Each structure stands twice: as structure tokens, then as C-alpha cells.
Amino acid sequence: FKDLRKDPKWSFVKLNPNNQFAEEVAEKKPISELATVGIYFFKSGIDFIEASLEMIKNDDRVNNEFYTCPVYNYLIKKNKKIGIYEIDINEMHGIGTPDDLLKYNDLMDFPKSRDQPT
């Protein structure tokens, strides 16, 4: 989705000049207006595992944590074609932060649990 505010809570993708495939991805660092929703698909499980292991071996962390999105950079370096499916920002609801989850719960009119602040 396009995040015109470029909120650094998301992952971002920069497309190649033809706007066909990902040229680079970044976690928590806006490199374009295209943010990801945190749902990833890997055509090959072994590609995911090998790229993940390489990321871990390189200690490629963000905020001292490993994330899934940067795995794609390792696949891009191997000339793998990484595509995106763009959705409208109004068709997704982030739930990656406590505030996002509370907003989503309010939107869906879910009852508040005892553990949630009121």
C-alpha cells in the first residue's frame, strides 16, 4: 500500500525503474512510499531458509531484531525476481503495535479483554 506519511513502523519496498520488481526492501526505514503489510510469500522454502541463514550469519538486524522483510534483499542479490501486490491503504489494518491492535479492535467492535487498557 502507499503510505504517503512514510511511517517508519512499516517495511518498505523500492521498485526497479520499470516498476516491475523489487530493487530493495527496508525494515522500519522509508525508502519509498510503498509499505508492506507483513504478509510474505516465498516460491521456494529453501530460498527462504538459505537467505534467512545468510541474513542471520551477517547479523543483519533492525533494532536488534531479525525481521522477515530484509530476507528479500538477499534473494534480490541472487537475481531472484521479487514482485509485489499493491492494495489500497483502506483495505488493510495494521496490528503490529499495541495502538494499531486497539484501533482494529475498536473498528471491529471487539469486546475489550481484561488485560487491555480502557
Language-model features and meaning:
Residues 1-59:
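Conserved core of the sugar-phosphate nucleotidyltransferase
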Residues 34-118:
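Conserved alpha/beta core of the MobA/IspD/sugar-nucleotide pyrophosphorylase nucleotidyltransferase superfamily
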